[in-house]
Curated annotation (Swiss-Prot):
Lineage, broadest ranks: Bacteria, Pseudomonadati, Pseudomonadota, Betaproteobacteria, Neisseriales
Keywords of the record: ATP-binding, Hydrolase, Magnesium, Metal-binding, Multifunctional enzyme, Nickel, Nucleotide-binding, Nucleotidyltransferase, RNA repair, RNA-binding, Transferase, tRNA processing
Cofactor(s) essential for the protein: Mg(2+); Ni(2+)
Binding site for ATP: G8, R11, R91, R137, R140
GO MF terms held by the record: ATP binding; CCA tRNA nucleotidyltransferase activity; cyclic-nucleotide phosphodiesterase activity; magnesium ion binding; phosphatase activity; tRNA binding
Binding-site residues, CTP: G8, R11, R91, R137, R140
Protein name: Multifunctional CCA protein
Cofactor comment text: Magnesium is required for nucleotidyltransferase activity. Nickel for phosphatase activity.
Length: 417
């Protein structure tokens, strides 16, 4: 019985990165051997055990065989006769198919170290094509390390998409990998890889449809709506924004793919037009509620947020109410964060100031100065309960108006200079 450190732990060690999780493979043992040594069985689908002291996962070396379409159609063989190389061969990428023995020696039968040094993601064997989740995983690793994908691997990924393997992916697995990819350092790279292999058209056709749609060059020097979306997503990542914010950044401009061709490159009404596509994506991916809600909110309101300097006080109050800013100020703030990424996610506009965010938050704070409880009590005491909402609005407007007037005056002064 021999144990080896495998997979991501070896990869990250060789990259000089912190090793977070350690997985082990056991060669020359069976389930009875593991149980006799005090290991606890935990694997439902595979023979995986917890170490009695460290509680790290130890899996018996195994081989796998495809039995049906999709990512669940596998049978496996785990026994004493399965070698380390056979176990490593079933893994997805060469950089994940290395092991380290007890003496620290690296076992690398498929050239993982070479590909790490070259910054290449390469599949281990044709068995890569048996699991469509690997398309997403490969795109995610590209986003993490900014590695390029080997020509033969991207070709295989294209074939998998053409053969309908991506259609077999269930929403939960797609979201699981997709969410991880969005939180990587270079999420733009994940979307680019998915587009290159054709999977984006299957998994997120609404995003794929943005590529090739022109925008006004004076507002968007990058021209292409798809490129702007990638830049906005990457800006959100560079800002260190959360998963819901990055997800909203990706979907904020879906309405641009709906713009009638006769008005291009203008996109009047794309904020409203994008709401339905955002809802479709949310439903297809079964996105968590907090992600889905923010994505829809940003899509619907980002243009209004940008144009705050042009709004009347009454319109501002209406926006604060319709976006539920009074009850959910944190969500309102995250939506404004995405608007910064949108503004700066343009060619050579990466450092454009966005005073609108601070102004919206100041407007909300000012409106909250109106004492709703006191107003409600006074109305009730005067037998005018039906006027409560109207009086609260009036008090909020009184707080908003001078702030908005000052902001517009400052804007006018800036424009003149």
């Amino acid at each position: 019985m021999q144990t080896y450190l495998v997979g991501g732990a070896v990869r990250d060690y060789l990259l000089g990165l912190p090793v977070k999780d350690r997985d082990w493979v056991v060669v020359g043992a069976d389930a009875q051997t593991m149980l006799a040594q005090g290991f606890q069985p935990v694997g439902k689908d595979f023979p995986v055990f917890l170490h009695p002291e460290t509680h790290e996962e130890y899996a018996l070396a195994r081989t796998e065989r495809k039995t049906a379409k999709g990512y669940v159609g596998f049978s496996f063989h785990a026994d004493k006769d399965v070698t380390l190389e056979q176990d490593l061969m079933r893994r997805d990428l060469t950089i994940n198919a290395m092991a380290q023995d007890a003496d620290g020696k690296i076992i690398d039968p498929f050239g993982g170290q070479r590909d790490l040094a070259a910054g290449i993601l390469r599949h281990v064997s044709p068995a890569f094509a048996e699991d469509p989740v690997r398309i997403l995983r490969t795109a995610r690793f590209a986003a993490r390390y900014k590695f390029e994908i080997a020509e033969e691997t991207i070709k295989l990924m294209r074939q998998m998409v053409e053969n309908g393997e991506a259609d077999a992916l269930v929403a939960e697995r797609v979201w699981q990998e997709f969410a991880k990819g969005l939180m990587e350092k270079n999420p733009r790279k994940m979307i680019e890889v998915l587009r290159e292999c054709g999977a984006l058209k299957v998994l997120l056709p609404e995003v794929n449809a943005l590529f090739g749609v022109p925008q006004r060059a004076d507002y968007h020097p990058e021209i292409d709506s798809g490129i702007h979306t990638l830049m906005t997503l990457q800006r959100a990542a560079d800002m260190g924004l959360s998963l819901p914010e990055r997800y909203a950044a990706l979907l904020h401009d879906l309405g641009k793919a709906k713009t009638p061709s006769d008005i291009l490159p203008r996109h009047h009404g794309h904020d409203l037009a994008g709401v339905e596509p955002v809802r479709k994506v949310n439903q297809r991916l079964r996105a968590p509620k907090h992600c889905a809600e923010l994505a829809e909110l940003v899509c619907r309101w980002h243009i209004i947020f940008h144009q705050v300097g042009q709004l009347k006080s009454q319109t501002i109050l209406n926006v604060l109410k319709k976006t539920d800013a009074f009850r959910r100020p944190e969500r309102f703030q995250t939506a404004l964060n995405v608007c910064i990424a949108d503004t700066q996610g343009r060619l050579n506009r990466e450092h454009t100031p966005y005073p609108q965010r601070a102004h919206w938050l100041a407007l909300l704070e000012a409106a909250n100065q109106a004492d709703s409880g006191k107003i409600a009590a006074e109305c009730r005491s005067q037998g005018k309960a039906h006027l409560i909402a109207e009086q609260i609005d009036r008090a909020r407007l009184a707080q908003i108006a001078p702030l908005q007037k000052a902001f517009r005056a400052a804007q006018d002064k800036t424009e003149k200079h």
